[in-house]
Amino acid sequence: MSPKVAYISSEFALSDELPTYAGGLGILAADLLYQAAESQFPLCGISVFFHEGFFQQKVGPEGKQEHFYDRIDPLKAGLVDTGQSVRIPLTDHEITLKIWRKDVSPTNKPNNQSTSPLYLLDADIPENTPEDRKFTDRLYERVWAPHLIDDLVLGVGSVRAARKLGLPIKVWHINDDHGTFNIMERLREYLEKGLSFPEARERVKAETIFTTHTPVAGAESKFSREEISFTMNALFNGLDVDPEEIWNLGKREWEGEEVFSLTVFAMRHARAINAVSRKHFDISRELWKFVNGEIPTAYVTNAVYAPRWTAKELGKVSAESTDKEIREAKLQAKKSAAETLGHLAYDKRRFDPKALVLVWARRFTEYKQPALLVSDLDRLVKVLISNDKPVYLLMSGKAHPEDPQGRSFVKQVIDASRDPRLEGHLIYFPNYSLSLAKELFAAADVWLNTPKVGWEASGTSGMKAVFNCALNASSPDGWWAEGFNGKNGWEIDPPDAENVYGLLEKEIVPIFYDQKEKWAAMVKESLRSCGPRFNTPRMLEDYRKLYGI
């Protein structure tokens, strides 16, 4: 099956052996590939093979985060050399990109021979200079915003790789603005064929879908006139187009200066622009209204590929299961997770699988409020420590190496976990990964999420918790703003310490221990109301309608 849709993303989170992802962007991209394979939908992914991926985390003896990088073995990661390569222009010379391929198969249908290919671009080859080979070493090494050259490799390289491989792509889906130079490269192609610039723009727009992920003003990729001019000269030199016209199509004001926004440029060259949740859609339409009407025209709420994330003990549980079936399956999943997690904890502590288990696991950054739960240890002791109603709080997540505040949050949580008053009921797990996340989903009775409202575009971890018979307690943001119905979990509004502690004390702990029938009813309602809506078959169908395929 030849792919007709190319999904361009800087991250794909396929496995721990191929950690070319930093977070939710990559998990979303990978889950879409899995679903496309299962549904036999003609979609491929194109990204970059970062040889050291994203950083690995460890915790030093003083409780401080340390980071290091492991070199990825392409063969162990399941990559296959296509034998093909392409060249792309930089500011003053060209580099060669090797093309790797990885086939993604559905996880729950072993007899399904359908696969979705992921193509990865690689500059670390002998044809390039030692300096140029480093361009595909590390993902987001210094700052969260991608570097200009990283974007060139992904954007320009994705088009040239598809052409070299003979892929009959009809629709280009740009997942966030990291792939925007894909649009510029296709403009260049049409100009070389003799089309006028307006004609080239119309052709490109007709074949482009753009997904925006940021809900925050100014958080997109932005470059100065000097930075972007080198790129435009490299791509459009000798063609009938005014560089100033291209600049104006991406220009925006930011902090008193004119900058080139990749998001603005992408929005002006896409026939469909989608946000990733209903709330994000509302925020985005206000956020991008200055782009002359080229604002998000739809929303496709993110979803997860459930077979990939559901513990095997819970694979047959549904909203129609009996209370006893749900309780027994969940306990078995927790027991299995407890055994594995005991070896992964920072201090090798273990939790009692029969106790109520709370989990908070995601990136340690300010807007997600990772230290909220440990902001009042006296109160936390009252929640966690009880002879007849014990509670465990499991936490995990990395802070970017260049985010000192995030790193301080990690230390704050680890310091709290050492407080003797908590008796080992707060456990931190370093080096958050896909495999660790799966164990935490299986362990969780309640999945906690505390972002500042308006800052979470969607989020998907809580969706995975649903399929593992965990209940969500979250800020009314992202996907939970449309998932919560008053009977399938809890809303933390506003997401402050008093509300979290109060909710745990007055509702969550008493219901878990004293109202088992109500707890089971809430789990069933969560499965019934959220399962079909936040599963990738629905998401792929929504995108299929946008693709027109």
Task: Enumerate the predicted regions with their spans.
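Catalytic cores of carbohydrate-active enzymes across secretory and cytosolic contexts
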Residues: 1-549
